[in-house]
Amino acid sequence: MLREIVARQDWQTQAITAVNRLPAHTPLFSWRSEAAARDDLASPSRTLLDGEWRFSFFEAPELVPEHWLVEDLPDACAIKVPGNWQLDAAYPGLRLATDVPIYTNIKYPFPCDPPRVPAENPTGCYSREFSVPADWLASGQTRIIFDGVDSAFHLFCNGRWVGYSQDSRLPAEFDLTSFLCGGDNRLAVLVLRWSDGSYLEDQDMWRMSGIFRSVSLLHKPVRHLMDIRVTPELDACYRDGRLKIALQAANGAGLSVAACLYDGGERVATLRQPIGTQAIDEKGAYDDRAECWLEVAAPRKWSAETPHLYRLTLTLLDEQGEPIESEAYDVGFRAVEIRGGLLRVNGQPLLIRGANRHEHDVASGHVVTPAAIEQDLLLMKRHNFNSVRCSHYPNHPELYRLCDRLGLYVVDEANLETHGMTPMGRLARDPAWSNAFLERVTRMVARDFNHPSIIIWSLGNESGYGPAHDAMYGWVKRADPSRPVQYEGGGADTPATDIICPMYARTHQDQPFPAVPKWALAKWIGLPGETRPLILCEYAHAMGNSLGGYAHYWQAFRDHPRLQGGFVWDWVDQGLDKLTDDGRHFWAYGGDFGDTPNDRQFCCNGLVFPDRTPHPALFEARRAQQPFGLTLLERQPLTVEIRSEYLFRETDNERLQWRLCEDGVVVSQGECPLTLAPQGSMMLTLLERLPAFAPGALAWLDLAIVQPAATPWSAVGHEVARQQCMLPAPLSLPVARTPATFIELADGWQIRAAASEWRLDKASGRVQSWCKLGREQLKEAIADHFYRAPLDNDIGTSEADHADPNAWIARWQEAGLNELQHRCLDMVVSPDQGVVTVHHGYFVGDALKLLTRWRHEFDQDGAMRLAIEVQVAAEMPSLPRIGARLWLTDEVLATGEEVSWLGRGPHENYPDRLLAADLGRWQSPLDVLHTAYVFPTDNGLRCDTRQLQLGSIEVEGLFHFSLSRFSQQQLAQARHQTDLVAEGGLHLCLDGFHMGIGGDDSWSQSVRPEYWLQPGGYYWNCVLR
């Protein structure tokens, strides 16, 4: 039998997507009492088959022996289900060196020849024994449900073929009733790594295989509920509700259904209705279906802010009114519509604070547990996200249940992407693939229909545009008129989308690509005849050290009502845990498993690291998206305005806390409750008079809105919003200075003052030694610094085998920034004034590219005052930084001693990503100043610093700084954090100016021009003590 089944090669026939698979439906549990269904108790009718299975591997399905159907093979090993076999420690797949995790963004991981896939098609053979209760065998129907198998599989039970399925992200359900026997039953599942379905699953993610979601058995009585779709409706005033229930029953003649709606423990609506419908057409009515409505006066509404849920139970009753089985669903009363060019929930226009989320676990790959899903969603809620896009496939069922309960809007997306096709829409225009396309959305809608959190259906991602999408759109709009549909392919504004949903369109700049232009956002919504809302399905590419310019998007969203937000790309770095040869853990990306083709670290685009530790960029997103506006109105008296962006919630759990600070020291503080209606505002006077601030001081007002009580997603004292408002202080007067003592040497100058002694080298013009209390502070001379270890956004290309000549790294290399030759052009020493002035030239060949003038003032109190002018040649590109580098000795910072600074913090920040980095007096251990991005780059900058205390060294002025055990050169050469080796000493970068990091995308020059360091003149200064 196995030979005949394999010989059919269903897995490379696009017209065959399944054989004997049951129709898709909403989740079923077959509770045998209405009370159990109401209380969501474990159902005895459902049994999990997760756990240890047996596993054998073959290089192709044709090599699997026939007798595997009835007995395990000698080489079979234990394997965990759910799991990806490439990540299972017991997997003996080293026999096929290419069967490893593969990361590729666009390219198919095999030759592109649809619907054919390679003959060398890794095949996993899963098996296990199970038994079922005797009463299951006696009557009713026993089903098996595979929640997710990648990419296709044949199912056998007790040596007999049951069926076939593909589409790795939706359930495959089969009727096992006729295959079962008493005692032990044997399941055998032949899983193929590649299938024609793989051409439709070309998402930007790791490609791995296996039974990666749960497997379960479900027993249903002979007469049972087959499918139930629940549609909440609100009247035109969004006050009263009605619940439409459409259901289908097997063998339903003479039966009836009882529906009960509960609000907590209170029953609020009931009805009983016989199975059967009114006449549908001239041929009559359905005898296995029913439609009914529950009227509910003034129900509590569901939204992401107020996720109130009712519980609906449906009980199938026999002719005598006795219960047969019950099903139940969480219900949220909410209305989704597009009206007046705006996406609305319950009449109010939304602002989508969204994230794209892949299902990814650092250890188990595509296997995500309910606890891990909850961790992600709680982090999102705590960082002011209100929406999640299931990119790019239907998710684990638990995600939707939790979004219903915690309060997050969901874009549910079909498992469809053909990014690697040329043209991208090739398959969408081929009628032979139409059914495969359509089925991907119809089955998703069937499974997820009842979740109130789902407010938008998505037809998939990056699959071009063709008649298949029109068919998908038309089917969804007919099957579910209660939700809009979106689809980005074909230019983001085709007839197959209700929402303009571009990816990586910019606030300020047109990108006129052929066939699929991306207009500047405000321009797009103003195009003639365009009335749809615009919501970015992807924006702010958070790859490594990124998210520069994020605040500009949020200013645009608030300035233009039809710009209704978007979904950051993306939530988590898709790094996988791997060991170095010497046993150290690191996060692997494309190529680290020997996988080809690969797109390197392009899988690491997250706001959180693989272990869910936040990137510094996550704090920027939280601040930009916060649901309150806080504005300083007047200084005398100190008056602020608070504006709520909540659409549905009153501020019943929010208090305002405020602090008045001078140079980081709190001089006054207080708090008060907030009583704001939804979208309301209020003014508060905090102080009648401001205190007098010291001359030259930094003074500011910190405002924070906190929740005094815990919520289902936050702890006591959770901070929802924060704002810092600068306050004026008198200017300080310059202090008279006394020059230090100068001693001329043969090759330089020695300067002594207080506890410090410096040596200037005549040949280089640089400070090459600095002793304090007899201890050397420098490992090499202080020098100009113009380079940074390239960021992912600087590298600028997502393709592993293409260089991008317009990328910043390429432009810097072309300009010779990596090979500048230094010459001291002149040095003028004025001992009586305590001043040394040096001109430095930086050349590529004979061409002068950079000219700097360093004015050193050495004071008797031990201070070296630096005033630095920089002239950048006209032909140079924007520089990454303009500053100075100091390689300090280890003695500068004692073991365990912390670094403190007065400036922006506490987390890493850059000139175009500092909205959330408040001024303060911060302290941090040295190692915390280093941000360990999966792919090492420049990191750890702190901007707008006035004072830096680094052990024995103090720096004053206005500068940015970073401090690391690793040089920029080592960071530039490393590929993983485990490649970094402490070089001895500390690398201190003091920057007068630093170019932005960008982040609109990671494959073009995404740094906004106002954050470039253009050719021209620059001046900065600082004081070293």
Swiss-Prot record:
The keyword Metal-binding applies. The keyword Heme does not apply. Binds 2 magnesium ions per monomer. Substrate binds at N105, D204, E462, E538, Y539, A540, H541, N605, W1003. The gene is lacZ. It comes from the Bacteria. Homotetramer. The record marks H358, H392 as: Transition state stabilizer. Mg(2+) 2 binds at N598. PROSITE patterns: GLYCOSYL_HYDROL_F2_1 (PS00719). It catalyses: Hydrolysis of terminal non-reducing beta-D-galactose residues in beta-D-galactosides. This is Beta-galactosidase. Belongs to the glycosyl hydrolase 2 family. Signal peptide: none annotated. PANTHER family: BETA-GALACTOSIDASE. It comes from Aeromonas hydrophila subsp. hydrophila (strain ATCC 7966 / DSM 30187 / BCRC 13018 / CCUG 14551 / JCM 1027 / KCTC 2358 / NCIMB 9240 / NCTC 8049). Transmembrane segments: none annotated.
